A protein has these predicted regions:
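Glycan-recognition and catalytic cores of secretory/periplasmic carbohydrate-active enzymes
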Residues: 1-340
Length: 340
């Protein structure tokens, strides 16, 4: 089967690559991805995005996930910025309205993790958490990009809500980490730190504040990003030079994901740009050296998805529901735009 998240990320990747580098081959693939995604994954009856289809386009799983909705908005908004395609913007705006109408939780606000095909609430959620940091991170990410191409006041208010939510509800300043899983009333359910999500959220909050052009918010998110990045470097860096995946309770894994290393590099460059401290560039060099030595497949290309205690898991697929060009392309785009 083919996933809505994977295909939305493919759409974003080739659109961003074309917008940044101008290669016509990227444009061709971006346009092909846009057409396929709109024709195949948009639920024209119930609104939203299908989770899974088979290779013939037949729907396999029509459940609605906030996560898939946000990546669809993200990919379509990027395609509009890259090409000026009105259909992409209109579809992204339509999905935004669906998410606001059907995905928001009315009592305590925020966005519920998942729904049935026709947007009915579920009796059970993954990790028993109706609200997650990860889903809201990608709402923040998608709304930031959508606001760059559609200056709607309602969208602006929802983006401001997302920034405030992360800074004052999801973030735990005593630990300098973001909580991950929540009940409906925003009580944290699990004691767990995800270092890749932490550092990614830090720099994405900075981008949201800059997009909102709010100087006070820019200063606040800059400081938060520095605090989070510093904490993750102190607690999450292994002695072999990679950012570990997570800590559950007092136990740290020895697992390194490809995307966690990427987000660490971006976060450290962002922290260096904010602070001017070369300490962050030294961390970039440490992680990037590990990546080149252990995570890049020098024979067949691309990156290995995972390493365990420094050794790559070579049998893991390079393309899957959760494995795509999005993080690696974004690394190239961010480094080019930040360092050119």
């Amino acid at each position: 089967p083919r996933g809505g998240v994977l295909n939305a990320r493919i759409l974003w990747s080739f659109s961003a690559a074309y917008r940044t580098f101008g290669d016509e081959s990227y444009l061709k693939l971006a346009n092909k991805s846009q057409r396929y995604f709109i024709d195949t994954f948009i639920d024209k009856k119930n609104g939203g995005v299908y989770w899974l289809v088979n290779p013939d386009g037949e729907v396999v799983n029509a459940s609605k996930y906030t996560y898939a909705m946000t990546y669809a908005i993200y990919g379509l908004a990027e395609h509009y910025l890259a090409t000026g395609n009105d259909e992409s913007l209109k579809t992204a705006v339509s999905l935004y309205h669906v998410l606001e109408e059907k995905g928001r939780e009315p009592l305590y606000d925020g966005y519920v993790e998942s729904f049935t095909e026709n947007w009915e609430k579920l009796d059970q959620y993954d990790n028993n958490a109706p609200k997650t940091m990860n889903a809201h991170l990608h709402v923040l990410e998608a709304y930031t990009l959508l606001y760059q191409c559609w200056k709607d006041n309602g969208l602006k208010k929802r983006l401001e809500f997302c920034v405030d939510l992360f800074m004052n509800r999801i973030y735990d300043p005593s630990r300098r980490h973001f909580n991950l899983f929540f009940d409906n009333e925003w009580n944290s359910l699990v004691e767990m730190d995800s270092y890749g999500h932490d550092v990614e959220t830090g720099w994405l909050l900075c981008e949201a504040a800059r997009t909102l052009e709010n100087q006070d918010l820019i200063e606040q998110t800059n400081q938060l990003a520095l605090d989070v990045t510093e904490a993750c470097l102190a607690e999450g860096m292994s002695d072999k030079g990679y950012m570990i995946y997570e800590k559950k309770g007092d136990r740290k894994t020895k697992h390194a994901s490809w995307w966690g290393q990427i987000e660490t590099v971006i976060a450290c460059v962002n922290a260096w740009q904010i602070s001017g401290s070369d300490v962050y560039l030294q961390s970039v060099d440490t992680v990037w050296t590990f990546v080149k030595d252990h995570m890049v497949d020098k024979e067949y290309g691309e990156w290995y998805s995972d390493c365990f205690d420094g050794e790559p898991k070579k049998e893991a697929p390079k393309v899957s529901m959760w494995r795509c060009p999005y993080h690696t392309v974004r690394l190239g785009v961010e480094m080019y735009n930040r360092l050119k």
